[in-house]
Regions:
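Activation-segment/catalytic-loop signature of the eukaryotic protein kinase fold
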Residues: 77
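Protein kinase glycine-rich loop
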Residues: 14-20, 25
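A short, low-complexity linker immediately N-terminal to eukaryotic Hanks-type protein kinase catalytic domains
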Residues: 1-13
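Conserved N-lobe motifs of Hanks-type protein kinase catalytic domains
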Residues: 19-20, 66-69
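Conserved N-lobe loop of protein kinases adjacent to the ATP-binding glycine-rich P-loop
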Residues: 29-36
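AlphaC helix of the eukaryotic protein kinase fold
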Residues: 43-65
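Conserved small/polar residues in nucleotide/adenosyl-binding loops
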Residues: 97-99
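Conserved short submotifs of the Hanks-type protein kinase catalytic core
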Residues: 80-94
């Protein structure tokens, strides 16, 4: 993903927040709801490996089913150029990278 890229005709990437071993996390604007969100994407070298795509999808599904004030909410999931999920953005908290 690149700064300025629009995903699903809805989410505009504005900033790279950080990266983990298998993924990047970006700050984005949800153009439909006019809110800031975070988008986690699988790194390109894992996209071609189905086991990693499935693992990433399970991560999104599992997190989406959790409901706790200390856990970010998952809003959306999809596969464009790479799998991604959209989650609640919390200002100044990079712990969401480690979901």
């Amino acid at each position: 993903m690149q700064i300025g890229q629009i995903i699903k005709e809805r989410y505009e990437i504005t900033q790279l927040l950080g990266e983990g071993g298998m993924s990047y996390v970006y700050k984005a604007i949800d153009k439909q709801l006019q809110r800031t969100v975070a988008i986690k994407t699988l790194k390109p070298n894992y996209v071609e490996q189905e086991k990693f795509v499935e693992r990433f999808k399970r991560e999104a599904q599992t997190a989406a089913n959790l409901n706790h004030p200390n856990i970010v909410q998952i809003f959306d999931w999809g596969i464009g150029d790479e799998p991604f999920f959209v989650m609640e953005y919390i200002e100044g908290n990079l712990s969401l990278i480690h979901i």
